Amino acid sequence: MKFPALLAALFLLCVGTLLLSSCSEAEGEVITLYVYNWGEYISDGSEGTLDVNAEFEAYCREELGLNVKVNYSTFSSNESMYAKISSGSAAYDVIIPSDYMIQRMVAEDLLQPLDLSLIPNYQYVDEAFKGENVYYEDDTDNVYSVPYFYGMVGVIYNTSIVHEDEENVGSWGLMWDDDYTGDILQFNNSRDAFGTALYYLGDDDGDGDFGINELSAESLPHWVEALKLLKKQKSVVQGYVMDEIFNKMKSGSAAVAAYYAGDYLSMYEDNDQLSFFYPKEGTNSYVDAMCVPAQAKNAELAMHYINFMCREDIAVANAEYTYYASPLTSVRANADYQECMSEVHEDAMDILYGETAASVPTQAYMNLSPEGLSMLNELWEELKVESTIGDGIYIGCGVILVALAALGIWQMLKKRRWAKLYD
């Protein structure tokens, strides 16, 4: 009887060991959530701020029983993000494009519908971003995205270089002012750069349409006028930039730049000589929103992440870090958030949400037709390549001059050497 009992005990011991090992492996299995966002667009734990991604990982362990690792990377333009997603070269679970790009990606089946039952914090999204008020066409049922931040484009200028009584302060004209040649920064993406020129050209009919969303054979002449403006601007532009603008404007190495209101507040915190206005002619309004790509491997977890980002404490942390306008009513009503923003800039809430933000005409970008996108790429290429060709001509001329000079010196030395031989 002892031998069968011993076998039974050994059997139970082995089974128990296997079960414990299996449980341990399950608890230790890491699920990687791939998130693709704009640069400087989340509270990351720097300088004492909340590390939102680390908080989500802790939330997953404690509330969902999952061992999650957030793999977080950034992009600098909608177009670069789109190129990566559409090529299939990388699989992300959460992406945060802008309104017009969301519309394009929906049309191309690059996004999957969201399950709002997994995103209960969606209830805190302001009604201005839902239903018929949705920030891009073709999604009045709010199927494909949840708004993250929104805002408007304005002009940032350094008051130690640009005087407040300057004639062009308040107008897009400041971006073309030759008094600041070599000190002006322009967007390094086609929609925003052409947008500055189209808004500067104005809304002739007074119907609120600046022609920014229609590019076809019929409307091409209007865009060619914008191209002429951008070509004219090249003589005063220091460079075409995106995230590089932060260091340039903070350090004072540039005087004027078109950029987003939230980023102005961030720059102002480090350089209080910077000022800002929304151009009187009109400007772009935009919404960046959280989406799940069609090829996401962890779609359900991605929606938990989106819901987490809409939780009040997390959304407040992100809003206090980025200084962008939040679409969540819970954030705007938060007293700590209001106090934080007033410490950054006395007019911060007005710039983001108040009369200043409502004082000029605005129009949001919508997706261009395939024909329009092709035309835009050609126009942008013409603008940028002309610069490259110009640089190439100068470099080529320089090389030729150096070569001719070297040839002349060589011939002179050769003559002297032969002259010595015959002396």
Regions found by a protein language model. Give the residues of each.
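Mature extracytoplasmic/periplasmic domains
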Residues: 288, 293-360
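C-terminal motif of bacterial Sec signal peptides marking the signal peptidase cleavage site
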Residues: 21-22
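Conserved C-terminal helix/tail region of periplasmic/extracytoplasmic solute-binding proteins
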Residues: 353-423
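Paired acidic/hydrophobic, glycine-rich loop segments that form the ligand-binding mouth/hinge
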Residues: 92-97, 238-239, 255-260, 275-276
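A ligand-binding cleft/hinge motif common to bilobed small-molecule-binding domains
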Residues: 101-104, 256-273
